[in-house]
C-alpha cells in the first residue's frame, strides 16, 4: 500500500501540466516525469522525488490518488504503474483530465497553491540535477 501511495503522490506533477498553458512547459514536465518513471525502482531519483512529493497539499494528494485508482490497472503496484508511464506517458493526460474534473482550479485555495509551489521548486531542482 505504501508503494501505491508513493506512486500516486509522485504523479502530482501532472497538476503542473494541467495548470500550464505554455506547451513548452507541458513538454518539460512530461519529460521530467518520464525521467522519473523510467528510473530504476528504488533509485536515488525516485527516492528524492518522493521527498518532493511530500511537500504537496493534502487535498491534491487525495485527488491524485483517486485519479490514479481510476486510470491505472487495478491491483498494480508502484513499479508497475511507473512502468506504464515510462512506456506511454499519454497516461498522464488521462490522470490530468481526472484531476481537472475532480479539483477545478477555481476550488484551489491560495494556501494550496503556495504549498504546491514548494513542491514545484523541489521537483525543478531535482530535474536540473538528475534529468538533464
From Swiss-Prot:
Propeptide residues according to the Swiss-Prot or TrEMBL record: 21-30
Extent of the signal sequence: 1-20
Name of the featured protein: U10-hexatoxin-Hi1a
GO MF annotation: an example: ion channel regulator activity
Predominant location category: secreted
Summary of the function given for this chain in its UniProt record: Probable ion channel inhibitor.
Annotated organism of origin: Hadronyche infensa
Keyword Signal assigned: yes
Description of post-translational modifications: Contains 5 disulfide bonds.
Keywords attached to this entry: Disulfide bond, Ion channel impairing toxin, Secreted, Signal, Toxin
Compartments, as annotated in UniProt: Secreted
Source superkingdom: Eukaryota
Tissue-specificity statement: Expressed by the venom gland.
Amino acid at each position: 500500500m505504501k508503494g501505491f501511495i508513493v506512486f500516486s503522490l509522485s504523479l502530482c506533477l501532472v497538476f503542473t501540466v494541467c495548470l500550464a498553458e505554455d506547451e513548452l512547459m507541458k513538454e518539460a514536465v512530461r519529460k521530467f516525469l518520464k525521467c522519473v518513471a523510467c528510473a530504476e525502482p528504488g533509485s536515488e531519483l525516485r527516492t528524492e522525488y518522493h521527498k518532493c512529493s511530500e511537500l504537496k497539499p493534502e487535498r491534491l494528494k487525495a485527488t491524485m490518488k483517486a485519479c490514479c485508482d481510476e486510470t491505472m490497472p487495478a491491483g498494480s503496484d508502484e513499479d508497475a504503474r511507473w512502468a506504464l508511464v515510462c512506456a506511454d506517458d499519454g497516461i498522464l493526460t488521462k490522470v490530468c483530465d481526472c484531476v481537472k474534473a475532480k479539483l477545478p482550479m477555481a476550488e484551489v485555495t491560495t494556501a494550496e497553491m503556495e504549498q504546491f509551489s514548494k513542491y514545484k521548486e523541489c521537483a525543478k531542482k531535482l530535474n536540473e540535477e538528475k534529468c538533464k
